UniProtKB/Swiss-Prot annotation:
Protein name as catalogued: Nif-specific regulatory protein
Gene that produces this protein: nifA
Protein role: Required for activation of most nif operons, which are directly involved in nitrogen fixation.
Organism this protein belongs to: Rhizobium leguminosarum bv. trifolii
Signal peptide start and end residues: none
GO terms, biological process: nitrogen fixation; phosphorelay signal transduction system
Alphabetized Gene3D superfamilies for the sequence: 1.10.8.60, Homeodomain-like (1.10.10.60), P-loop containing nucleotide triphosphate hydrolases (3.40.50.300)
Keywords, ordered alphabetically: Activator, ATP-binding, DNA-binding, Nitrogen fixation, Nucleotide-binding, Plasmid, Transcription, Transcription regulation, Two-component regulatory system
Lineage start: Bacteria, Pseudomonadati, Pseudomonadota, Alphaproteobacteria, Hyphomicrobiales
Positions of ATP binding: 40-47, 103-112
Annotated Sigma-54 factor interaction domain residues: 12-240
Subunit structure: Interacts with sigma-54.
Pfam family of the protein (one): HTH_8
Molecular function via GO: ATP binding; ATP hydrolysis activity; DNA-binding transcription factor activity; sequence-specific DNA binding
Residues within the DNA-binding region(s): 325-344
Length: 353
């Protein structure tokens, strides 16, 4: 097979300082075989970063294998990751290699790692510690060599404290945490991404659509709580409904009140405040130009204890980071917003340091 000439990470679009910073970290991390934990909100591109780490590593010619662990029972996960022998259970009509075997020599991405059951956590930990496994229904021990990358949007520290996630597994997978920035923190990247998604739409549909400058200005003011995935959805829907080859503000789905289904709209409102429906920032307006009822920063009031970082741990991180919240967030594997929230809750001021 000819070697790919595509630059690693070419599918990651953006020029913002926040994006460049995590791209640099990912490139550095790729030089080792240490486990990586990709953290961040849903839709921030964790799978793309996992692939970037793989493609930039010495394992780039070996397989990159992924599995989304969400909603899979312990039995299904065991079969998917470790494989099974013929007749191991009802329906096992043939031998099957698991994802660990398929990824041997390469990289294994376990997405939604925070959703695996306590029952399976112990089995996964054993494989990670010993580098060997047995297929379900088998007796032969198989050696496996994979670079593990995990991804989650869950607060694993809270899960550990609540006894929902094993502390030993947490330390095993959280060797190098990388927190991906949400789209609202990536200054200037929304127009670039929207253009990319529109170009893709044009290729796939034989169209030649373009954005009016005013349309990109409106998109740039949106928070997009669903991040890149939501922006892609918005762009595709708007392009589909556009009245001409130039997409004007009136074509935007959010301008026509069609951004979310009623159920999703209610869920988003409960999570981030009514002012963030379709992500309009505080001080901006909704579709008819009326002031938003609640600013997006009301999200802090519903963060609750799940985002609170322990005082001693927070003070140590802030001291190490020289009071730079973004750096402290990377050290803690949290978001800068969670760091700021915890500083205020604990009443910590710079003079402490």
């Amino acid at each position: 097979m000819p070697k790919s000439t595509v630059r690693p990470g070419a599918e990651i679009v953006g020029e913002s300082a926040a994006l460049k910073e995590v791209l640099e970290i990912a490139q550095i991390v790729a030089r080792s075989n240490s486990p990586v934990l990709l953290r961040g909100e849903s839709g921030t591109g964790k799978e793309f970063f996992a692939k970037l780490i793989h493609d930039s590593s010495s394992r780039h010619e070996k397989p990159f294998v992924k599995l989304n662990c969400a909603a899979l029972s312990a039995g299904v996960l065991e079969s998917e990751l470790f494989g099974h022998e013929k007749g191991a259970f009802t329906g096992a009509t043939s031998q099957k290699e698991g994802r660990f075997e398929l990824a041997h020599g390469g990289t294994l991405l376990l997405d939604e790692i925070g959703e695996i059951s306590a029952e399976f956590q112990a089995k996964l930990l054993r494989v990670l510690q010993e580098g060997e496994l047995e297929r379900v229904g088998g007796t032969r021990t198989l050696k496996v060599n994979v670079r593990l990358v995990c991804a989650t949007n869950k607060d694993l520290e809270t899960a550990v404290a609540a006894g929902e996630f094993r502390a030993d597994l947490y330390y095993r997978i959280n060797v190098v945490p990388i927190t991906l920035p949400p789209l609202r923190q990536r200054d200037g990247d929304i127009p670039r991404l929207a253009q990319k998604f529109l170009q893709r739409f044009n290729r796939e549909n034989g169209r030649s659509l373009s954005f009016a400058p005013a349309t990109l200005d409106i998109l740039s003011k949106c928070e997009f709580p669903g991040n890149i995935r939501e922006l892609q959805n918005c762009t595709q829907r708007t392009a589909t409904l556009a009245r001409s080859d130039v997409i004007v503000p009136q074509d935007l789905a959010c301008e026509q009140g069609r951004c979310y289904s009623p159920i999703l709209k209610k869920a988003v409102a409960e999570q981030v405040g009514k002012g963030a429906i379709h992500g309009l920032a505080r001080g901006e307006t909704e579709s008819m130009g009326q002031p938003c009822d609640v600013g997006v920063f009301a999200a802090e009031t519903v963060m609750g204890q799940s985002g609170l970082i322990g005082r001693e741990r927070l003070e140590q991180a802030m001291a190490t980071a020289g009071w730079v919240q973004a750096k402290a967030a990377r050290l803690l594997g949290r978001t800068p917003r969670q760091v700021g929230y915890s500083l205020r809750r604990h009443g910590i001021e710079r003079k402490v340091f």
